[in-house]
């Protein structure tokens, strides 16, 4: 290896220089160094000429080992990049070696080498022979010229095959080289090399089978690979047959059969025909006539089945050959008895089985079976006539005297066809031997003794010696009973009367048995003779019966023959179909396996390609870096050389050696170059300036000289143009004149034909008029017929349309009658329900009157006690204290003296925080105002009456009350963003027992007289109330407003809420002007109920959701719950919502009686039907409403919640934040998880009352609070405390002012807790109300229809920041818009901002903390 590295281009140049001076070895060394170098492992275009030159030198110098190393290195270089280059190089190498060998052979007179093995040219025998014998010049020349080149060529073939083995990319080249190697062996008669070549190919094939997982491995299942291997093996078989190497030929046959076994598809017929042809030759050469004939049989059948274009001549030739080969099979068995006994290990049997396997046979063939097959497949009819009778003479006819004469004619004809049919000549000796044996067998059956000369005369083509040999072989092998008497020259047959050693049936023509056979079969013959005798003497009736049975059998066969034939044909067809199906399944399986293997190989190939691509990329990157370095150095060198060529550079770089580039400073070189460039640039600028000045002066002088010349040329051009125009104009005029003269001449000539033209046209029209008239008449008839047909069709269609319209109208009328009937039934049911509700209400009012009377008496006694205590206190304190007391509000005083009870002192209400009920959930955004009440004087009395009503434990009244409302737990206004519903789904919060909207007023408060049943109650006002006159029952102005309200006028019945709807309307509840809830849903809509403004539950579930559609009366899911179902007691007196309102209740009229908000939804209500029996939106929320699951006796959701429960959200705690409580049988889908953001959870510190647990009584009796049997004695504090102890967390008995401020603190804490919770994104359906929003319904059970409208307005106008998800708000809003007749006014706080809808939109962008503000009445409003 040289000490320095050379580039490939330089190495090739260097090698060429060595070759020019005749130094091949140094040139080879230079190229060898480049090829072995590890720095150029990436293939380049220069590698191919280097490799060709390298191999050329190897061939010239006969360096086969160097050629081998170079080829292996080149294979590694270009295998993944350019495999075609490797193929070209290998082919060029072998071609070059063959050419040199051919030239050496031409120079030598020795055509065939005497050397047996080229690998061992100098054997000990050859050395001794050369030493003792003389060697002439020619022999020495042959040995020096031809032998080395033949050896080199053989080594080249072997090395190339080793190089290319088991590589799918060069598989074609591998097989081409193998076939060339076989030709080489055949050309130079190299038997030893042929054997080695066959062994190498066999080893390569086994390696392919072992290393099939390599990336470039050959897939033997590939049809192309199999065909190439078979082609190579057939060439090997041909070469072995040509070289008469029968052992190698037999091995080649086994290799071919092994390749057939590897292939799952059958080989091509042409290939099999060639295979059988070659195998038959091998069998015949090996002396195995039996398998030779069997192979020809297979070839004959294959040709008949597969070859479509088989000519009669070819069929005749093949049939003749098959016949002769079959008859040439020796009659003598291959093995004698002794050989059969000596074959202990079954070697011969195994050999026969292997040979049969090579032909695809299940068992070894025999001579008799082949003859039968030949006859069965009718091969004799295609045999030539001259040979056709040979079969009958040898195998059928018994004529020993003429046998040899006949056979001799056939054999003579075969010998005459030596030129046309050379393959038939080989059968003549075997046919003669078989003829001799047949003659001996037939003679033995006729003669007992015959002379030897007589027998020789019968066999003219056999001499005496061969005849005697044939007789001895027949006696030994064929069990022929013959004895030769040499003294008398005779032959004796059948003289041995012993038992026969074999019981083989006679083969060939048969006349009679031998004497030994008679003796051996005497008993059998006797039995046969007796049977014949019995048959002869059998009576006639037995024969007749037998004949009749025979006829019956024949008739039965004739009857069933067609059916049986059809069954056999069907069975054959079934077998064929099954074969085809199995073949298709095998093909499909093979295809799938092939695809799977291809996929796996593709994966492996892709992985290998990716790896090689990465390696090639890295090598390419390294090569590019090296090239860049070289280019850089080359550029620097060239630049220095250029600089040194200049005058200045030669001086500047005179002492610098260009070869020492690494020692030079790049900055120094660059500075020198820049300096030189600047100098040259300045010189160039000077030259350019001088040139510019020179060109400028020259151009100016030229233009001054050319001005007069241009003027002169212009004048000349103008004159010539004028002359040309005049000439062209004259020519045009003359041409026009000539054309006009010709036109006039044509006109005159054609005018003479005008009369003839007119006469011809008139005659033509006259002749065609009749045809026109006939066609016109025919058209008119067709037109009339078509009109008639179309009119009839139109008439028929109209009749059909009228009939269809009649039936359709009839069906619609029937449907309308059915609907009217259903509507009437629904109205009747509603009427019955209304009457029942009215009866219950009257009963309730009567009971309420009694309770009020009892409460009034109790209150009078309490007031008397208080007055006495007050007097005692005044007497003790004296006149100063009594004077001070006049300014101090009394705890038991009337409303004017207590801001806590008082209706509204604006100053005091601004100062004092509003007292919050512990059941209101701490919702500061929904304060209660006195302005919505008819006077706070009634609240005290009402609360006391409610307490008495709750305390009397009347379960019957509770059941009647709760039966009218089965909506689930009662909710306060703060809970679900809307008023609760009562009997008639009327909105309005109802005051519970412990409603903290102010203490209930006593009888002595200056509220004005209590209203009776029929009063059209204006507001009961205190002395200092400045709210304006209270509205009566008939006023339709909406809720009253105080003097300090600036909310705008209340809307009355006729305000623009849209027309009210009747019973048959299906529009859904009315909506306000700015409502964005979408259109109201009708009866047939299946969208699910609407959702409220601030719901964040996601869309309400529709009818197709998994909790099932809302049920109506006509649904087949079971009856809807009715009045008397066990869904839990209806809410009554002991319900925690407070007593129902009566007629004389002073909290505002109940809806439906004298309510000025429009009549209750009933029969004459034109606001759309209530959600009733057939309403598919789900039943309405009323006393029969089941939009939430009705609470049954077994409902485990805990006690129902009313207005007197204090809760931050409608749902509280871990179990109450999941949406509506569900009954045991509900199928509305999964409950909402605790993590859903539907309001604050119910904390341990919340004082809403006890949570319901599993241990609470959920039996058949309605749940009711624990109340003592008698009312609490003492003042209202004691009663309040008793109620708090029974209903919820106890309140400390502080004065009202202190409790207000403590509640304000609690509110602040809860507000801060709400602020810490994430602000929900307010969607359009959760926004609050504004000026045009229709007010919610107020249930009559809440008794605050007109008294508390403004608090509800304020609550709706200012919802909380984190409003709990209210799953029933949307429904309540819909129902209250249906049933509320009076539009609600907007709160005063709402006029200060456009609407809280817009604030909701703004809160999406910037959520803000709620701010509490108090108005002049002392009510707190949440501003955000």
Swiss-Prot record:
Name this protein carries in UniProt: Eukaryotic translation initiation factor 3 subunit A
Region described as Disordered: spans on this chain: 821-849, 868-1424
GO CC, alphabetical: eukaryotic 43S preinitiation complex; eukaryotic 48S preinitiation complex; eukaryotic translation initiation factor 3 complex; eukaryotic translation initiation factor 3 complex, eIF3e; eukaryotic translation initiation factor 3 complex, eIF3m; multi-eIF complex
The protein's role, per its UniProt record: RNA-binding component of the eukaryotic translation initiation factor 3 (eIF-3) complex, which is involved in protein synthesis of a specialized repertoire of mRNAs and, together with other initiation factors, stimulates binding of mRNA and methionyl-tRNAi to the 40S ribosome. The eIF-3 complex specifically targets and initiates translation of a subset of mRNAs involved in cell proliferation.
Keyword Amino-acid biosynthesis annotated: no
Main localization of the protein described in the UniProt heading: cytoplasm
Biased composition (Basic and acidic residues): 868-919, 939-1259, 1276-1412
Repeat region (Sequence), residues: 994-1003, 1004-1013, 1014-1023, 1024-1033, 1034-1043, 1044-1053, 1054-1063, 1064-1073, 1074-1083, 1084-1093, 1094-1103, 1104-1113, 1114-1123, 1124-1132, 1134-1143, 1144-1153, 1154-1163, 1164-1173, 1174-1183, 1184-1193, 1194-1203, 1204-1213, 1215-1224, 1225-1234, 1235-1244, 1245-1254
GO biological process: formation of cytoplasmic translation initiation complex; translation reinitiation
Residues of the PCI domain: 315-498
InterPro entries per the UniProt record, alphabetical: EIF3A (IPR027512), eIF3a_PCI_TPR-like (IPR054711), PCI_dom (IPR000717)
Family affiliation: Belongs to the eIF-3 subunit A family.
Keyword line: Cytoplasm, Initiation factor, Protein biosynthesis, Repeat, RNA-binding
Quaternary structure and partners: Component of the eukaryotic translation initiation factor 3 (eIF-3) complex, which is composed of 13 subunits: eif3a, eif3b, eif3c, eif3d, eif3e, eif3f, eif3g, eif3h, eif3i, eif3j, eif3k, eif3l and eif3m.
Keyword Zinc: no
